[in-house]
């Protein structure tokens, strides 16, 4: 992979960082010193939980905070300050009430620009989670709405939290299609207000960030018609710190990132249990947490600051600047990877290898219905039995066969997951459209029905048209599964 010149300048040897940290650490702070650390979190933004609520509930930050050298006998006062969106966190950082914050890509740009403009500089020090193609942000409509794709929203009243990652996604969607800003009647509404207004039919659609484009359909009153994966541009959530705090207490920033890395490992080690705990702590349903952070999840947990993420942030800034939505911002010096590099080094991890990796947590295991292992994770599925475990399946057809088999046994399906054939993101099976049927190379019907899931109705229609199948609902796809499928 070719690394841009500015990214190469970030590749500071870990040894130099350690020397710098040790030199900075000379001289104790004093036995009576109390270091106050304000951490701005977004508990209900599911792809940030390993940077916030998980650290808080498992005590991981306390585990790694430095207590030797200049920090000997120092006391720490942690203030966890939660918000449902990024602007209050940026305000808190500008007021120096929050020293460490987490937010999505477009809010990160606003945070960095505001800091530079007000002389309260921040720095991007780590990533929490990403989707390399933009998945996670989305637009939903009422479940019984006649709208099925973005083009249907022309002239309609659509809400989104202004300044959010979802807002950025919607701006990008218009630019990609050459559409003007007044294509729709766009208004700013928080997730809570937008959700209520959608249920009460006061708006035609609502755009939002993680987890709302999955959460609202899961709760039964919405349907997703657009996912950020359609932009094919990365989306991410990252960690920013006040620059003065990082300069004064670099060891604390490194400790935070080490805690983040352990939280990521905890989430991956037993994703079902982790999702259940996150539901307990945040009230976001475990099945929704799992679709983002479990195997095959929409987002990948990885703190490394990859060159392609920097390129994406530069493109985000350019898009906002063209629309005069953000002030001048010098992005390159705002990115500081020395802390995450040092955290990797202290944990014995290979940062350079992680920079090159886009590996997530693929679906794997043995399919109990079709009696074969999962060989192609991008075509696999999963079923979460209510009160039970999560079972992998080798294909969408085998997953739906599993739904029928488990239901026949009297087991209640908490959630079934399939992979979108076009966008590559995980879907709730009952929210997908399906192309079923199909013909072989000789034009004859296949011996067993092909069942291919899609988020978007028009993608399913196109696939069915091109492969001699038909568009089907979830119920129709279930009915098409033969009882002897193995």
Tell me the role of every PLM-derived stretch.
Residues 43-46, 249-327:
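Secondary-structure end/capping motifs
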Residues 397-408, 461-465:
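Short active-site loop/helix that positions an aromatic residue
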Residues 29-180, 185-188, 204, 233:
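Short, glycine-/small- and polar/acidic-enriched structural segments
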Residues 367-370:
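Short cysteine-rich clusters marking metal-coordination/redox-active sites
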Residues 387-399:
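Beta-edge loop/turn motif
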Residues 321-363:
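Conserved C-terminal helix/tail region of periplasmic/extracytoplasmic solute-binding proteins
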Residues 186-187, 192-281, 404-416, 420-422:
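Pocket-lining segment of extracytoplasmic ligand-binding domains
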Residues 1-35, 358:
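Short, low-complexity disordered leader/linker segments with a strong preference
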